Protein backbone atom coordinates (compact mmCIF):
# COMPACT_ATOMS: atom_id res chain seq x y z
CA UNK A 1 0.00 0.00 0.00
CA UNK A 2 2.79 2.40 0.95
CA UNK A 3 4.58 1.55 -2.30
CA UNK A 4 1.47 2.52 -4.33
CA UNK A 5 1.15 5.83 -2.51
CA UNK A 6 4.84 6.60 -3.11
CA UNK A 7 4.50 5.75 -6.80
CA UNK A 8 1.38 7.91 -7.09
CA UNK A 9 3.09 10.84 -5.39
CA UNK A 10 6.18 10.43 -7.55
CA UNK A 11 4.07 10.28 -10.72
CA UNK A 12 2.11 13.38 -9.67
CA UNK A 13 5.32 15.29 -8.91
CA UNK A 14 6.82 14.30 -12.27
CA UNK A 15 3.70 15.35 -14.19
CA UNK A 16 3.62 18.65 -12.32
CA UNK A 17 7.26 19.23 -13.27
CA UNK A 18 6.58 18.40 -16.93
CA UNK A 19 3.53 20.68 -17.01
CA UNK A 20 5.52 23.48 -15.38
CA UNK A 21 8.33 23.03 -17.91
CA UNK A 22 5.90 23.30 -20.84
CA UNK A 23 4.20 26.31 -19.29
CA UNK A 24 7.56 28.10 -19.05
CA UNK A 25 8.16 27.60 -22.77
CA UNK A 26 4.82 29.02 -23.93
CA UNK A 27 4.32 32.78 -24.11
CA UNK A 28 2.23 33.98 -21.20
CA UNK A 29 0.24 36.46 -23.26
CA UNK A 30 -1.44 36.23 -26.63
CA UNK A 31 0.49 39.03 -28.37
CA UNK A 32 3.80 37.25 -27.68
CA UNK A 33 2.64 33.90 -29.07
CA UNK A 34 4.20 33.51 -32.55
CA UNK A 35 1.93 30.58 -33.42
CA UNK A 36 -1.21 32.77 -33.39
CA UNK A 37 -2.39 34.84 -36.38
CA UNK A 38 -0.96 38.36 -36.58
CA UNK A 39 -4.43 39.92 -36.41
CA UNK A 40 -5.13 38.13 -33.12
CA UNK A 41 -1.80 39.19 -31.66
CA UNK A 42 -2.21 42.83 -32.74
CA UNK A 43 -5.75 43.03 -31.34
CA UNK A 44 -4.53 41.60 -28.03
CA UNK A 45 -1.59 44.01 -27.82
CA UNK A 46 -3.72 47.06 -28.66
CA UNK A 47 -6.27 46.05 -26.02
CA UNK A 48 -3.51 45.97 -23.40
CA UNK A 49 -1.92 49.31 -24.35
CA UNK A 50 -2.79 52.51 -22.54
CA UNK A 51 -3.53 55.68 -24.51
CA UNK A 52 -0.12 57.01 -23.43
CA UNK A 53 1.61 53.90 -24.83
CA UNK A 54 -0.29 54.18 -28.12
CA UNK A 55 0.67 57.84 -28.51
CA UNK A 56 4.26 56.94 -27.62
CA UNK A 57 4.38 54.55 -30.57
CA UNK A 58 3.81 57.56 -32.85
CA UNK A 59 6.73 59.58 -31.47
CA UNK A 60 9.87 59.73 -33.60
CA UNK A 61 12.67 61.49 -31.68
CA UNK A 62 16.20 61.95 -33.02
CA UNK A 63 18.16 58.78 -32.39
CA UNK A 64 21.75 60.02 -32.48
CA UNK A 65 21.37 61.39 -28.95
CA UNK A 66 20.12 58.11 -27.54
CA UNK A 67 23.36 56.18 -27.06
CA UNK A 68 26.76 56.54 -25.43
CA UNK A 69 29.95 54.94 -26.69
CA UNK A 70 32.33 53.72 -23.99
CA UNK A 71 35.52 52.16 -25.33
CA UNK A 72 34.30 49.54 -27.76
CA UNK A 73 30.76 49.19 -26.43
CA UNK A 74 27.50 51.12 -26.74
CA UNK A 75 24.92 51.80 -24.03
CA UNK A 76 21.53 53.54 -23.92
CA UNK A 77 21.98 57.15 -22.82
CA UNK A 78 20.25 58.63 -19.79
CA UNK A 79 18.28 60.80 -22.23
CA UNK A 80 17.02 57.63 -23.96
CA UNK A 81 16.06 55.98 -20.68
CA UNK A 82 14.15 59.08 -19.59
CA UNK A 83 12.41 59.32 -22.98
CA UNK A 84 11.24 55.72 -22.73
CA UNK A 85 10.10 56.18 -19.13
CA UNK A 86 8.30 59.50 -19.63
CA UNK A 87 7.07 59.42 -23.23
CA UNK A 88 6.94 55.68 -24.08
CA UNK A 89 8.58 56.37 -27.48
CA UNK A 90 8.23 53.54 -29.97
CA UNK A 91 10.52 54.81 -32.72
CA UNK A 92 13.85 56.52 -33.26
CA UNK A 93 14.97 58.32 -36.41
CA UNK A 94 18.58 58.72 -37.62
CA UNK A 95 20.17 56.68 -34.85
CA UNK A 96 23.04 55.58 -37.10
CA UNK A 97 23.49 58.84 -39.01
CA UNK A 98 26.83 60.70 -39.02
CA UNK A 99 27.08 64.15 -40.61
CA UNK A 100 27.51 67.84 -39.68
CA UNK A 101 23.87 68.10 -38.63
CA UNK A 102 24.18 65.31 -36.05
CA UNK A 103 27.70 66.39 -35.04
CA UNK A 104 28.70 62.72 -35.23
CA UNK A 105 32.15 62.11 -36.70
CA UNK A 106 34.44 59.15 -37.34
CA UNK A 107 35.52 59.34 -33.71
CA UNK A 108 32.12 60.04 -32.08
CA UNK A 109 29.76 58.13 -34.40
CA UNK A 110 28.87 54.51 -34.92
CA UNK A 111 30.94 52.38 -37.27
CA UNK A 112 29.11 49.27 -38.56
CA UNK A 113 30.17 47.12 -35.58
CA UNK A 114 29.17 49.78 -33.03
CA UNK A 115 25.91 50.42 -34.92
CA UNK A 116 25.00 46.78 -34.41
CA UNK A 117 25.80 47.03 -30.71
CA UNK A 118 23.78 50.26 -30.42
CA UNK A 119 20.69 48.80 -32.07
CA UNK A 120 20.87 45.70 -29.90
CA UNK A 121 21.43 47.71 -26.69
CA UNK A 122 18.51 50.06 -27.38
CA UNK A 123 16.19 47.18 -28.30
CA UNK A 124 17.23 45.16 -25.26
CA UNK A 125 16.62 48.13 -22.96
CA UNK A 126 13.11 48.74 -24.32
CA UNK A 127 12.11 45.08 -24.29
CA UNK A 128 13.38 44.54 -20.74
CA UNK A 129 12.34 47.87 -19.19
CA UNK A 130 8.86 48.61 -20.52
CA UNK A 131 5.56 47.17 -19.41
CA UNK A 132 4.74 45.41 -22.69
CA UNK A 133 8.23 44.92 -24.15
CA UNK A 134 7.40 46.32 -27.59
CA UNK A 135 10.58 46.59 -29.72
CA UNK A 136 11.63 49.94 -31.19
CA UNK A 137 11.16 50.86 -34.82
CA UNK A 138 14.53 52.23 -35.94
CA UNK A 139 14.16 54.42 -39.03
CA UNK A 140 16.78 55.99 -41.27
CA UNK A 141 16.58 58.35 -44.22
CA UNK A 142 18.56 57.25 -47.26
CA UNK A 143 17.31 58.96 -50.45
CA UNK A 144 20.84 58.94 -51.91
CA UNK A 145 22.59 56.46 -49.64
CA UNK A 146 22.77 55.91 -45.93
CA UNK A 147 24.51 58.80 -44.13
CA UNK A 148 26.47 56.59 -41.74
CA UNK A 149 30.09 55.73 -41.10
CA UNK A 150 31.13 52.93 -43.43
CA UNK A 151 28.07 53.34 -45.66
CA UNK A 152 27.90 54.28 -49.34
CA UNK A 153 26.48 57.66 -50.29
CA UNK A 154 25.49 58.22 -53.92
CA UNK A 155 25.45 61.61 -55.67
CA UNK A 156 22.06 63.19 -56.29
CA UNK A 157 20.82 65.64 -58.87
CA UNK A 158 20.67 69.28 -57.88
Q: What kind of region is each of these model predictions?
A:
Residues 1-27:
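Bacterial Sec-dependent N-terminal signal peptides
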Amino acid sequence: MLNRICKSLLFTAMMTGVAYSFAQQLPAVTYKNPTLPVETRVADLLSRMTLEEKVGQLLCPLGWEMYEIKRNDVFPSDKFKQLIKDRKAGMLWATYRADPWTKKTLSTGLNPALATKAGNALQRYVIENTRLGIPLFLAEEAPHGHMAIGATVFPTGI
